[in-house]
Curated annotation (Swiss-Prot):
Pfam family, one: ATP-synt_ab_C
SUPFAM superfamilies documented for this protein: C-terminal domain of alpha and beta subunits of F1 ATP synthase, N-terminal domain of alpha and beta subunits of F1 ATP synthase, P-loop containing nucleoside triphosphate hydrolases
Cystine bridges: none
Annotated protein name in UniProt: ATP synthase subunit alpha
Gene from which this protein is expressed: atpA
Enzyme class: translocase
Site, Required for activity: residue positions: S373
Organism: Burkholderia ambifaria (strain MC40-6)
GO annotations of cellular component type: plasma membrane; proton-transporting ATP synthase complex
Compartments it resides in: Cell inner membrane
Length: 513
């Protein structure tokens, strides 16, 4: 086809007129220095606090320090290829992570990238990792239980949906075991679990994932892992990422449980970042805002009202309240709960479960110190049957501890004191429990009933646990209807109490334990 010169010029003119030249206006800066994952940048005049920055090689960073003539940023991931003079661009975006049901059953890093070798996550939505907690008006009081399946917790330190309950203790005294048991016990209870591992060995995280898979708990669990080999930035961000994933379910009228294991390591990572950014150190070299670091995270765990859920989902979900329950873990040094981070988190949470090394070494596991462990709001959420039966246990243990300390110095004890000591020994034995074997509500109720009504008093201490197990097995085989009634009503009626008493007495007479 031949075109004459005039047609060619017309064609070029029309193409030029139809051209839409779009310019990508972005602020640029230059890297001044790179040290230990911290970058100083000159020339980023309109950057926001917490904004994502784009570095060469598809690497991103987070702007944390905004100073007069430079910006201090932390790099997310590898930083070996970044050097002085590199160009940095603003993105105009706050850090976001993928959220949604697609993450359930997966192991991801602090940015939501899969690290379990099972392919991409394919989440349809993302959400900001830093969000403001729901206001007072949108919250509901805690009234539904989270059953951990651990006798001493469900009986004496009950946890409710939307509560923040701290698990605190020295290293190697069973903190993670308590948290994992709580996850395993949520099978079939319509509760999504999120386990955030911060600063742990990769092998330890793998063991937890393997155990969750073996027990079928990965079907409703998300694992967010920032191991000890990951950068301080990843360890600092992991809890916020996990919290955002949990909020997805809370805001849509579902229930979620999140475990931060542990926040001491997150505080260490934040201290490291802050000192490298040259922020002024305070007590124990932590920065001044380390309280806010944890308070803004834990305040996001809440039970939200039906109105909040309806407003959030634009009317799609009606009449359902959502909750996010948090179990933060704190590691103490030589039992010192008066250190900076432990006191901070104790004051933020709604109660704490103290685990003691001495109890652990004495074979009392879980090593829960009932005297100083409290649940400030969980009592309202406790199931009727457990609430009815657990009061006596706490009293028995408190009296036993007081008398045990006194009895060391007294040679001759009166009959009443001796009885209380014997009862206390048996209750302490009863509250022992093997790992990965959480109990159902009826099993806990039966154990508490037997202890309260003196059925353990004439047993040898070593016979207590075999008796309890034998009794549970006997009820399963011979009294399934009674078990079903207790499970369905979560209460113990007069008739059921009579049937239970008769069942325990006949089992005890049989001596099959």
């Amino acid at each position: 086809m031949q075109l004459n010169p005039s047609e060619i010029s017309e064609l070029i003119k029309s193409r030029i007129q139809g051209l839409e030249a779009s310019a990508d206006v972005r602020n640029q800066g230059t890297v001044i220095s790179v040290t230990d994952g911290i970058v100083r940048i000159h020339g980023l005049s309109d950057v926001m606090q917490g904004e994502m920055l784009e570095f060469p090689g598809n690497t991103f960073g987070l702007a944390l320090n905004l100073e007069r003539d430079s910006v201090g940023a932390v790099i997310l991931g590898e930083y070996e290829h970044i050097s002085e003079g590199d160009v940095v661009k603003t993105t105009g975006r706050i850090l976001e992570v993928p959220v949604g049901p697609e993450l359930v059953g997966r192991v991801v890093d602090a940015l939501g990238n899969p690290i379990d070798g099972k392919g991409p996550v394919n989440a349809k939505l993302t959400d900001a990792i830093e969000k403001i907690a729901p206001g007072v008006i949108w919250r509901k009081s805690v009234s539904q239980p989270v059953q951990t399946g651990i006798k001493s917790i469900d009986a004496m330190v009950p946890i409710g949906r939307g509560q923040r309950e701290l698990i605190i203790g020295d290293r190697q005294c069973g903190k993670t075991a308590v948290a994992i048991d709580a996850i395993i016990n949520q099978k079939g209870k319509d509760l999504v679990c999120i386990y955030v591992a911060i600063g742990q060995k990769a092998s330890s995280i793998m063991n937890v994932v393997r155990k969750l898979e073996e027990t079928g708990a990965m079907e409703y669990t998300i694992v967010v892992a920032a191991s000890a080999s990951d950068s301080a930035a990843m360890q600092y961000l992991a809890p916020y990422a996990g919290c955002t994933m949990g909020e997805y379910f809370r805001d849509r009228g579902q229930d979620a449980l999140i475990i931060y294991d542990d926040l001491t390591k997150q505080a260490w990572a934040y201290r490291q970042i802050s000192l490298l950014l040259r922020r002024p150190p305070g007590r124990e070299a932590y920065p001044g805002d380390v309280f806010y670091l944890h308070s803004r995270l834990l305040e996001r765990a809440a039970r939200v009202s039906e109105e909040y859920v309806e407003k959030f989902t634009n009317g799609e979900v009606k009449g359902k309240s959502g909750s996010l329950t948090a179990l933060p873990v704190i590691e103490t040094q030589a039992g010192d709960v008066t250190a900076f981070v432990p006191t901070n988190v104790i004051s933020i949470t709604d109660g704490q479960i103290f685990l003691e090394t001495d109890l652990f070494n004495a074979g009392i596991r879980p090593a829960i110190n009932a005297g100083v462990s409290v649940s400030r709001v969980g009592g309202a959420a406790q199931t009727k049957v457990v609430k009815k039966l657990s009061g006596g246990i706490r009293t028995d243990l408190a009296q036993y501890r007081e008398l045990a300390a006194f009895a060391q110095f007294a040679s001759d004890l009166d009959e009443a004191t001796r009885k209380q000591l014997e009862r206390g020994r048996r209750v302490t034995e009863l509250l022992k429990q093997p790992q990965y074997q959480p109990l159902q509500v009826w099993e806990l109720a039966v154990s508490l009933y037997a202890a309260n009504n003196g059925y353990l008093d004439d047993l040898d201490v070593k016979q207590v646990l075999p008796f309890e197990k034998g009794l549970r097995d006997n009820l399963k085989t011979s009294h399934a209807d009674l078990i079903k009634r207790i499970e369905d009503t979560k209460d113990l009626s007069k008739d059921d109490e009579g049937a239970l008493r008769a069942a325990i007495e006949s089992f005890k007479k049989s001596g099959a334990y």
